[in-house]
């Protein structure tokens, strides 16, 4: 196993522990708690894949961070922070909408790279809006936290989420996954619309109604893709 992979996991575990202690003091805002919950799932998946104990890795990560901080001057820290690009966290959904459990009458699931696409194929003739919470850097989608499809009544009928065991995805991966979800929902004569933030950062091209501009041929192809259940 690559040593960098192990040490990266150890540092991530320790930093998550620090963030958790911060949240335990009720100091974290909603986006902070969002990321904390998602990162916990990711660390569990990575730990299982690597065969590493999280508690042991956290202790090792603490030692690594302490060694780095011992050598870090305040001036170097200021320069590092100044050189970092500005990261923004955008939220379409409330914490309740993100954490709410939902069920599917006719479940369909597809894995596309490191993203899992789920939808209820029993939903027909509904108006559906896609909402997402994600981070943006350099005016582009950087990391998808969670995307969900809601009916006008507020029911959840679809979802795109990162796989905890396969971290890392591009904005193009997210765009393709959204296309698959839209295609599957439109196959049952649902009308799918996209939130303004998703229009701006994930699609950049939509009609006035907020619906992504997908060619009919592409829509049919994406819908057929969802026919096979994983």
Curated annotation (Swiss-Prot):
Residues 1-73 are annotated as: RNA-binding and homodimerization. Residues 205-230 are annotated as: Disordered. One of its GO terms (cellular component) is host cell nucleus. A motif (Nuclear export signal) lies at residues 137-146. Residues 180-215 are annotated as: CPSF4-binding. Upon interferon induction, ISGylated via host HERC5; this results in the impairment of NS1 interaction with RNA targets due to its inability to form homodimers and to interact with host EIF2AK2/PKR. GO terms for biological process: symbiont-mediated suppression of host cytoplasmic pattern recognition receptor signaling pathway via inhibition of RIG-I activity; symbiont-mediated suppression of host gene expression; symbiont-mediated suppression of host mRNA processing; symbiont-mediated suppression of host PKR/eIFalpha signaling; symbiont-mediated suppression of host type I interferon-mediated signaling pathway. Residues 223-230 are annotated as: PABPN1-binding. GO terms for molecular function: protein serine/threonine kinase inhibitor activity; RNA binding. It is found in: Host nucleus; Host cytoplasm. Gene3D superfamilies: Influenza virus non-structural protein, effector domain, S15/NS1, RNA-binding. Pfam families: Flu_NS1. The keyword Metal-binding does not apply. A motif (Nuclear localization signal) lies at residues 34-38. InterPro entries: NS1 (IPR004208), NS1A (IPR000256), NS1A_effect_dom-like_sf (IPR038064), uS15_NS1_RNA-bd_sf (IPR009068). Keywords: Eukaryotic host gene expression shutoff by virus, Host cytoplasm, Host gene expression shutoff by virus, Host mRNA suppression by virus, Host nucleus, Host-virus interaction, Inhibition of host innate immune response by virus, Inhibition of host interferon signaling pathway by virus, Inhibition of host PKR by virus, Inhibition of host pre-mRNA processing by virus, Inhibition of host RIG-I by virus, Inhibition of host RLR pathway by virus, Interferon antiviral system evasion, RNA-binding, Ubl conjugation, Viral immunoevasion. Homodimer. Interacts with host TRIM25 (via coiled coil); this interaction specifically inhibits TRIM25 multimerization and TRIM25-mediated RIGI CARD ubiquitination. Interacts with human EIF2AK2/PKR, CPSF4, IVNS1ABP and PABPN1. Inhibits post-transcriptional processing of cellular pre-mRNA, by binding and inhibiting two cellular proteins that are required for the 3'-end processing of cellular pre-mRNAs: the 30 kDa cleavage and polyadenylation specificity factor/CPSF4 and the poly(A)-binding protein 2/PABPN1. In turn, unprocessed 3' end pre-mRNAs accumulate in the host nucleus and are no longer exported to the cytoplasm. Cellular protein synthesis is thereby shut off very early after virus infection. Belongs to the influenza A viruses NS1 family. The dsRNA-binding region is required for suppression of RNA silencing. This is Non-structural protein 1.
